[in-house]
Amino acid sequence: MMIPELPDYLTGLGGREYLGLIIALFTLTAGLSRPFSGKITDTVGRVPVMAFGSLVCFVCGFLYPYLLTVWGFLVLRLIHGFSTGTKPTATAAYVADVVPANRRGEAMGTLGLFTAMGMSIGPAIGSWLATGYSMNVMFWTSSAFALLSIGILLRMPETLVNPQPFRFSLLRLKKAEIFDKQALPPFVVLLLQSFSYGAVITLISTLSTSLGIANKGLFFTVYTLASLGVRLVFSRSSDRYGRVPVLLVSSVMLVMSMALLIMAQTPIIFWTAALLYGFSSGMNAPTIQAWTADLADEATRGRAMATMYIALEAGIGLGALGSGWLLNHLLGQAGLSASFGLSSVLALVATGYLGWLWHRDRQPDRRQVRSTDDTALLNGEP
């Protein structure tokens, strides 16, 4: 709800040079809190971690109108990041708990469907509230939705078997609890792909203004509606055809979307890029969550999800910082083109990596083939 209006809001406070920090600070604490949220999710439970994330959203949304300095705003963005560092981790683990493995892609798609609905409606409502009423009304409305979320969560049953009471000693992490090596392939893919989202949420309001589009939230509405459509039609695609092939298609669409944003001199190209970005997101998000759950052990599912989300936050944060820096040092269209160009290149690298994984998985295991041949020879078979 807030994202499209925050760049102008920070500029109004006198902090235009800090636009990249709006997302970077948010994703910094989100990323740092992921290992902790993963461990707490696997020990204390899914529901308490989800409720904590919603509580952070409620408090921060309420406080934004009262911190009227650049540094006060940035500190609050830093704190607000704990919400994203906790709730999605526990939510993904919760969904993976309650559905069978052969329908995991469909379930993650349904989760993403409702997430996308909020993301499509939220920015448009946020811009409408900020323009028609005030930024404060937008902030408080966001806080009210977070409070409603808490009320729903408190009525949900816990899915973790034998949850433990919270104790501060759980916040002491061992090295092995920070990163789940089994989630490395999704980590690499998402790190490369999510740079583009950091660039989009930092720069799309500037690009919208340059094209004469008044409502800066409409790009998010279009891409999220496209994402909704993909999730509705192709919700079981990764369950049928495999995670990597679906991710490969979505990555190609991401490259195309970023390439179009480089060339976006007219609204038609702009909206086409938004559609492709939505198609990519609609296929990518549920599939990479299901892929991570497939690779993880049941006992460390929260940690694996946290590892995946660390890549998401790191990529978004780097994308926001990098695009903000490029916009400030390469003014105008040059800064926009450089940012979206870099996003396109990184997405292309992710596409190549997925292509290699797809090719590798299609090849028979050479050691297994050799072992079968040796056994046949020992048995006197031709």
Set out the residue ranges of the language-model regions.
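Residue-level signature of mid-helix packing/kink "hotspots" within the transmembrane helices
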Residues: T27-P35, M119-S120, T224-L228, L232, ...
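Juxtamembrane intracellular "pre-TM" segments in multi-pass secondary transporters
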Residues: E158-L190, D373-G380
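C-terminal membrane-cytosol helix-exit motif in multi-pass small-molecule transporters
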Residues: A144-N162, Y353-W358
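Structural signature of the two symmetry-related core transmembrane helices
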Residues: V49-F62, S143, P245-A259
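A membrane-interface helix-boundary motif in multi-pass transporters
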Residues: T131-S143, W325-L346
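Helix-loop boundary and gating motifs at the non-cytosolic
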Residues: M1-I22, P185, V189, S194-L207, ...
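Cytoplasmic helix-loop-helix junction between adjacent transmembrane helices
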Residues: L78-T115
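Conserved MFS/SLC helix-loop-helix module at the cytosolic interface between two early adjacent transmembrane helices
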Residues: L32-P65, Y241
